[in-house]
Regions:
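Helix N-terminus capping/helix-initiation residues
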Residues: 26-27, 75, 133
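N-terminal capping segments
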Residues: 1-67, 150-152, 156-170
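Short glycine-rich loop/turn motifs that provide flexible caps or phosphate-binding loops at active sites
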Residues: 16, 22, 31, 102-105, ...
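...with weaker cross-activation on analogous glycine-rich loops/strands in unrelated enzymes
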Residues: 2-6, 47, 63, 67-128
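Solvent-exposed, non-transmembrane amphipathic alpha-helical segments
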Residues: 32, 78-82, 138
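Intrinsically disordered, low-complexity, compositionally biased regions/tails
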Residues: 21, 27, 87, 110, ...
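Active-site signature of cysteine proteases
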Residues: 114-154
Length: 170
């Protein structure tokens, strides 16, 4: 019997295809998340969808599930100390990655031999599923919400065919 997806991941899947609008106009969906989360959750004032919004997306998914976010949720690196650290993946766990000039955060949906398959925001300027190299996972960068029952380790093997690889989510 397949395990039920966490509420935050179910919401995240519903958002696949939401895109930022490059230039002077901004996505009403993304800006709606920014407005709903506000400075108190995001930690800074966000005025456009040009600001890196992977952390905003994860925070919105957690809010929908009734869960708290880290102090400066807009920053991907803030998620590396949020909740509890995992030593093995679970469907929907938060993955925090390093990259030149910043970081990235998204949700585990599976993996192949060399990459995690990540559902996240601001991946190619959209909510999408992409592959990110396992060696980019930040120290302590596999996380689970505090106070939420922890399922068994769940390695989900996926085929890499047709899933793009990203090296810079900015």
């Amino acid at each position: 019997m397949a395990s039920k997806e966490p509420a935050w991941l179910a919401f995240a899947r519903q958002q696949i295809g939401v895109r930022e609008i490059v230039g002077p106009k901004h996505s009403p969906v993304i800006m709606g998340w920014v407005q709903r989360l506000g400075i108190k959750v995001l930690g800074i004032k966000v005025v456009d969808d040009e600001t890196a919004w992977c952390g905003t997306f994860v925070a919105m998914c957690m809010m929908i599930a009734g869960l708290a976010s880290p102090a400066i949720a807009v920053r991907a690196s803030s998620w590396a100390t949020w909740g509890r650290e995992l030593l093995g993946p679970r469907l929907g766990c938060v993955l925090v990655f390093t990259r030149t000039g910043g970081g990235h955060v998204g949700f585990y949906i599976g993996e192949d031999a060399t990459h995690f398959h990540v559902l996240g925001g601001n991946q190619g300027n959209a909510v999408s599923i992409t592959r990110i190299a396992k060696d980019r996972l930040a120290k302590g960068g596999m996380r689970w919400p505090a106070g939420v029952a922890l399922p068994a380790v769940q390695v989900i093997r996926l085929n890499a065919a047709g899933v793009p690889v990203t090296v810079n989510e900015a």
